């Protein structure tokens, strides 16, 4: 199958080989068409569920000296300017740019969405940089985000804001410890929100209080990502029992 040519090369890097990613059907579940979207990408409001938020941040806390990433699952709403982020999947904490594990994980996540809930799909990407003071969106994040945006044009990238996370205990903020990036009219990734445009909000105002409780109890130890699942397939990458 020409669609998968080159995928077996375990040293291929997504930073240089984004065209080798197979074509997934993300957007067929979610149902956003670019022609209906116009140039309002930076005006979209992303409502982030507590479960999705906690899994992403706890994954980064489990690997504080590594960059980590994840996939954002969600759906459109009756309001075309609002995207609901329902869940998230922790991906990797090592070799984030290797194609074969990324390919496997995306296929499994897509199948999971189809089985779990109608209308649920892969709609965005999460990234946490290695250094807490690094708030720049790197090439790997942009390229994976680009790939998802090919099939879901309103796809956001959520970047962990290490400084906000570090100060959370002191300031008790109710805002997410994340920076939102969306594509502008020229299809370049741009930080949103500073100009009153798009924003990401927590759908449950108490989410940061719950996050602080999870940090105090070291809940991050229980988070499973795809790196761990690929090493031991008995480990649940969906983390379905994490908050039971």
Spans of features found by a protein language model:
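N-terminal beta-strand/alpha-helix entry module and adjacent surface
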Residues: 6, 11, 23-124, 128-244
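Ala/Thr-enriched low-complexity intrinsically disordered regions
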Residues: 2, 12-18, 28
